[in-house]
């Protein structure tokens, strides 16, 4: 096989195309993985529209699992036929951040099939910018993790998303028996956070999203944690300007929530959720919301609030998820709500953008 099907962007979000390109050959330090399952995330299209991709044309996608199809001459610890997940976060491996389990802060960090996080020279990203929404992907050998036999390819393809939820929960520094608010709770990050909450001692959940029926479905993932829902479409029409969401959160948690895990990509939810945080509590944001906060520095000072931004998980966060899956302490098959063939990748992208139906974690199977 000399060519493969891949989902490519040529200039921006309006120029996606499914096309045949050459199957990659491994360099000395590479492996080539035959992709069995690849995750699909709406943030890709947003970043394309923002012009955040440094190399175009490129193959999209940053979450994948499959089997090793080829091994470079200097690659160690991996063999043809191994079941693996691809850890597509590129970093230098030598800086202070990489050496202290903070590799997502590395100045060189970027994501295959996604975007770079700053404008500096990034030789690894230059070499490995092509992503995983294809039949094969070339990746440095040190960025594949062995996949336990008990973990299926579809779930393995979403380990990075679950690792991001683990990272957000860690940043929240939750006490045992905590109350947390999860915004955008019906998406991939929200559903992963609900699923993982019991592993972080959460005692009460408050889920925020647009529609009650979708929120109630996500509440079923909590493993028995008491869960309340706040449907934005049930708030007064002027909630965005009157602070009605803040008021509702305070009704449900009169003393305030210990933390808000906020995955909203735009709008006033982030700021209003911040007002529902208890004194000394934390809002962890991983939604890319560009709407300014309503709170003043004085409000943060007087309430001793922490606002923590996070852009990715660490490698160890992802490995922690794999261990939970391997031992059975975490099950995640029910999170995979949609499966698309690679031949329908354009339709899959459209479905993810529209979200006409409940969708937690969609995957593409080449």
Label every model-predicted segment.
Residues 184-185, 288:
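NAD(P)H cofactor-binding loop motif with strongest signal on the N-terminal glycine-rich segment
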Residues 1-4, 271, 315-366:
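C-terminal hydrophobic helical "lid"/dimerization subdomain
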Residues 182, 198-268:
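Adenosine-nucleotide cofactor-binding segment
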Residues 202-203, 219-225, 264-329, 366:
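Glycine-rich phosphate-binding loop and adjacent beta-alpha segment
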Residues 24-38, 50-99, 103-104, 148-150:
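Glycine-rich beta-strand-centered segment in the early N-terminal region that forms part
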Residues 92-181:
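NAD(P)H dinucleotide-binding glycine-rich loop of Rossmann-like/cofactor-binding domains
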Residues 164, 188-189:
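Hydrophobic/small residue at the entry helix of a nucleotide-binding pocket
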């Amino acid at each position: 096989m000399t060519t493969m099907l891949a989902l490519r962007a040529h200039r921006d979000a309006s120029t996606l195309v499914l096309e045949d390109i050459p199957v990659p050959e491994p360099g000395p330090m590479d492996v080539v993985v035959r992709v069995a399952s690849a995750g699909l995330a709406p943030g890709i299209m947003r970043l394309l529209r923002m012009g955040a991709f440094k190399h175009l044309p490129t193959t999209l996608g940053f979450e994948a699992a499959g089997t090793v199809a080829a091994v470079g001459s200097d690659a160690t610890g991996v063999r043809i036929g191994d079941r693996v997940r691809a850890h597509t976060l590129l970093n230098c491996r030598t800086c202070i951040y990489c050496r202290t389990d903070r590799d997502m802060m590395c100045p060189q960090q970027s994501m295959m099939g996604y975007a770079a996080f700053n404008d500096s020279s990034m030789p690894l990203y230059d070499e490995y910018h092509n992503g995983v929404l294809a039949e094969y992907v070339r990746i440095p050998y040190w960025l594949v993790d062995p996949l336990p036999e008990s973990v299926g390819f579809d779930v393995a393809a979403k380990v990075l998303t679950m690792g991001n939820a683990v990272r957000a929960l860690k940043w929240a520094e939750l006490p045992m028996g905590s109350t947390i608010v999860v915004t955008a709770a019906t998406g991939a990050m929200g559903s992963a956070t609900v699923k993982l909450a019991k592993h972080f001692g959460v005692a009460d959940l408050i889920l925020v999203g647009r529609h009650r029926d979708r929120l109630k479905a996500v509440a079923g993932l909590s493993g028995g944690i008491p869960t309340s829902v706040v449907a934005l479409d049930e708030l007064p029409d002027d909630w965005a300007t009157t602070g009605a969401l803040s008021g509702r959160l305070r009704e449900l948690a009169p003393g305030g929530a210990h933390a808000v895990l906020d995955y909203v990509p735009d709008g006033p939810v982030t700021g209003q959720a911040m007002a529902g945080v208890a004194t000394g509590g934390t809002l962890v944001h991983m939604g890319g919301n560009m709407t300014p906060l309503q709170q003043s520095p004085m409000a943060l000072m007087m309430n001793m609030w922490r606002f923590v931004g996070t852009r990715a998980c660490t490698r160890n966060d992802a490995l922690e998820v794999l261990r939970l899956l391997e031992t059975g302490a975490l099950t995640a098959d029910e999170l995979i709500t949609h499966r698309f063939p690679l031949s329908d990748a354009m339709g899959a992208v459209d479905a993810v953008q529209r979200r006409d139906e409940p969708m937690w974690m969609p995957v593409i199977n080449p």
